[in-house]
Amino acid sequence: THGKMQTIFADTISFRPQFEEGLIQQGKVKSIKRPFNDEYQRLKKLEISSRETEKFIQICRDNGLVPMTTCFVREHVNSLASLDFKSIKVASYDCASFPLLNELADKFEEIVVSTGATFDDEVKFAAEILKNTNFSFLHCVTLYPTPLNQMHMARMDWLRNFTSSVGYSDHSLVSETGLLASKAALTLGAEIIERHFTILPHGDTRDGPVSINKVELCELSNFSK
C-alpha cells in the first residue's frame, strides 16, 4: 500500500478575486470562500522541507509502503522526481490540467488521478494522455464531508472504460458513517481506497472530521484482505 503526503507551498498560490468572498449563482456555489491572506498563512505553517520529504520517503520504504505525494503545480514536477518519488497523485481539480499530466507521464512510474469536479470529456482526454502509462482513476465527490446518499459509487464502473485500475477517494464523515463508504467501494471492486489519516482527535484539524485514525486504518486494511 501507499503513504501519501502533500507537496504544496504558500508562495505558489495566486490571488483570485472570486475566492475572497466566494461566488454563488442561482443557488449554486461557483467559487468557495477562501481569502488569499488566510490561505497563505495556513499553507505557510504546513510547508514541508526537502529534508523532511526525504525522511518521509525513507520511513515509508522502511515500513514496506510506497511513498507518494500530490503534485499541484508544474514547477514541482522535476524536483519531486529528483527526490525519488516513483508514484504521484493528481488532485481532482488538476485532472483537467493537461500540460501537468503530460509532464507527469514522462517522469513517474505510477500516476493516480482523482476525478472529482471533472467533466466526462475532461476525464476522457486525461485518459488519452495517460494511456501509455501505469495510471489509475479515483472516483471522488468534491463535497467535504460527503453524505452517503451522494457517493455515486456507480461512477467507478464508468471509469473502468478507461483503465482497469479504479478506486475511490473517501471524504465521508467518520463520526457518523465510520468506514461504511470505504468498505462499500471495496465490495464494488475498488482497487484503491484513499483516506485522509490523522493521529490527532478528529476535531483538531481542518480535515480531521473526514480523516481516519490508526485503529480505523487497521480495520480498513483487514477488511480489504
Task: Identify the role of each PLM range.
Residues 1-225:
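Catalytic cores and adjacent flexible loops of soluble metabolic enzymes
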